[in-house]
């Protein structure tokens, strides 16, 4: 399958027609017609085309918003009952919001923002008023970067004071349709980007001046309280003023051999101004919060690259950063340290094998609820802090070792390896409760799932055949079932179309879960019991439906509203299939004809190919 992907997917565009009978006389290009379908114009004619389900924690339910030419509507879905219902009576809620906010709203233009479910029947949301809130502090617009060279007096002139718009906070009960203004509303926690919070919430790690530091939960609460309800520079300034007890964890960090994550896009001037401030760092927590691993990059011998920022600046600003290129003798070197919080010790793992190797750490699968105020955490792939899984990859990307490290002794063991004469493509490692592992590989020419024992010995190939598994979507160990996306398996279909499948861990009972000659994109809930299926082709109306993971359709949910687009004269592209130059290989593509296409005329063709692989490596 790799060869098929490398050839890419073709898009053919028919452009300026040639008059029949005279190939040398081209008709004038119809730019006006093409301009009608410029992206910024199409955007105004398109509404919702797929459902992005917001799963509600503690339930199987989810909610979503859907926009048509009639306006925006909000729905909540109960997958167990296979029922969807409108959250609001749009006319009624518009009238109530008008009464409270004194701004005129109607059913087609609801101002509802930032919906957050508290439980399956209770949600909160915001409505922004048209009026300034004179009781709030004003926002001082951040000074553009090019203005930092001005003197203090000139800087003050550059500041613009802008009042915040008043925001109303509401709570709504779905079962009773009761709306209540939350006059005592308090802003939720807003976690700074630099904060790496442990799974138990007791330790927060960050970088400062290239080294690692930590604070405890009580000090972190002071920081959250200081930044509560504030945005941008005001939040940063308020947080910086809080006095907390920082404990330094490392002392050997330096520029280009740092524990901090280098922020691309920062100019040299901004980097100087931010020196000494808290920074993000790349760490992975153990699930029990006793240890964490840090990834450190040594770029001291790597060469510089430069970008000049000139679009937003009156004067160009320079950004200097390290960048490895093909053929460079000295490139970035990586190392992994294990930090023990109880003993304050650091264990440097001996991970060296391939010259100029790359490394990656395997993290555990986590389900993120959109309404959660919890900080995002990266937890390493293990049930405790005793083991640590990672991979190392040769510079030419032809060899990969999947390894496990003992975090007490530092011993590193190769569990299994991948070798190919072409590049080895990687996906996540899945760890079962037994300690066994699921691994995705293209070793037989197709992407498939393999089952390894905890000792690294291959037990069996789970999926096989002339099709490609794209990715594992979920694992239900209680049912010994894997859910995955794949393409190329169904006969008489474009092999690029994706479907959702299930298979037992022992390789039996593989089942297609969303039939239909369409490209399917799915979103599964945390329990792996239900999924939303968005499906279409380039020449069909996008639709969405609810399924259970036995493959039963529970409900049709939505069809996209393309009425305005079609009324403007839009026409679907046309899929096609042809043989390549070898006369054997099938090529699949899409042809887009001019909207005033005349079959009696001749048209030159523009062939657009997007070849692979899409990867950046040296």
Please annotate each region the language model reported:
Residues 1-9:
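Bacterial N-terminal signal peptides that target proteins for export
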Residues 9-12, 26, 581:
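Residues at the start of alpha-helices and the adjacent loop-to-helix junctions
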Residues 12-20:
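Hydrophobic h-region of N-terminal signal peptides that target proteins for export
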Residues 20-542, 546-547, 563, 570:
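Beta-propeller folds
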Residues 53, 304, 519-618:
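Serine-hydrolase catalytic core recognition
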């Amino acid at each position: 399958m790799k060869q098929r992907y490398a050839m890419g997917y073709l898009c053919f565009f028919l452009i300026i027609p040639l008059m029949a009978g005279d190939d040398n006389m081209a008709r004038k290009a119809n730019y006006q017609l093409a301009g009608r379908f410029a992206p910024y114009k199409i955007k105004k004619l398109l509404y919702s085309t797929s459902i992005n389900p917001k799963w509600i924690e503690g339930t199987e339910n989810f909610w979503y918003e859907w926009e048509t030419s009639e306006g925006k509507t909000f729905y909540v879905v109960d997958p167990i009952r296979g029922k969807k219902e409108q959250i609001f009576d749009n006319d009624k809620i518009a009238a109530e919001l008008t009464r409270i906010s004194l701004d005129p709203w109607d059913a087609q233009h609801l101002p509802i923002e930032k919906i957050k479910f508290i439980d399956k029947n209770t949600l909160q949301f915001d409505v922004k008023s048209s009026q300034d809130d004179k009781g709030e502090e004003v926002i001082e617009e951040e000074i553009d970067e090019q203005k930092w060279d001005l003197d203090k007096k000139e800087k003050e002139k550059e500041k613009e004071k802008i009042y915040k718009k008043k925001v109303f906070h509401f709570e709504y009960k779905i079962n009773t349709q009761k709306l209540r203004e939350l006059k005592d509303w308090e802003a939720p926690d807003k976690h700074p980007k630099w904060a790496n919070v442990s799974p138990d919430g007791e330790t927060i790690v960050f970088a400062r001046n290239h080294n690692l530091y930590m604070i405890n939960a009580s000090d972190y609460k002071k920081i959250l309280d200081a930044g509560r309800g504030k945005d941008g520079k005001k939040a940063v300034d308020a947080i910086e003023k809080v006095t907390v007890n920082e404990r330094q964890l490392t002392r050997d960090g330096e520029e280009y051999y740092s524990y901090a994550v280098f922020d691309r896009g920062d100019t040299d001037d901004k980097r100087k101004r931010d020196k000494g401030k808290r920074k993000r760092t790349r760490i992975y927590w153990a699930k029990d919060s006793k240890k964490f691993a840090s990834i450190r990059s040594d770029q001291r011998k790597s060469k510089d690259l430069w970008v000049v920022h000139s679009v937003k600046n009156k004067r160009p600003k320079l950004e200097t950063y390290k960048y490895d290129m093909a053929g460079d003798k000295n490139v970035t070197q990586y190392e992994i340290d294990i930090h023990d919080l109880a003993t304050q010790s650091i264990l440097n793992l001996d991970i060296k094998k391939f010259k100029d190797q790359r490394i990656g750490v395997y993290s555990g699968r986590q389900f993120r609820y959109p309404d959660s105020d919890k900080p995002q955490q990266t937890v390493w792939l293990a049930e405790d802090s005793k083991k640590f899984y990672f991979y190392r990859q040769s510079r030419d990307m032809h060899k990969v070792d999947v390894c496990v490290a003992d975090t007490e002794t530092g011993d590193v063991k190769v569990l299994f390896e991948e070798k190919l004469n072409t590049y080895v493509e990687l996906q996540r490692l899945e760890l079962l409760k037994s300690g066994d592992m699921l691994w995705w590989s293209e070793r037989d020419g197709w992407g498939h799932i393999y089952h390894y024992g905890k000792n690294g010995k291959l037990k069996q190939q789970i999926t096989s055949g002339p099709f490609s598994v794209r990715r594992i979507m979920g694992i239900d160990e209680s049912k010994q079932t894997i859910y995955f996306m794949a393409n190329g398996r169904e006969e008489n279909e474009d092999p690029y179309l994706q479907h959702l499948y299930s298979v037992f861990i022992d390789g039996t009972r593989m089942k297609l879960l969303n039939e239909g000659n369409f490209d399917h994109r799915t979103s599964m809930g945390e329990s792996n019991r239900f999924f939303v299926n968005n499906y279409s082709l380039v020449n069909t109306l996008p639709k969405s439906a609810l399924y259970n993971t036995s493959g039963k359709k529970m409900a049709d949910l939505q069809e996209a509203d393309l009425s305005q687009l079609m009324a403007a004269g839009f026409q679907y592209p046309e899929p096609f299939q042809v043989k390549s130059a070898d006369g054997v290989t099938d090529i699949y593509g899409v042809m887009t004809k001019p909207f005033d296409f005349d079959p009696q005329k001749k048209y030159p063709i523009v062939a657009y190919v997007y070849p692979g692989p899409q990867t950046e490596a040296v």
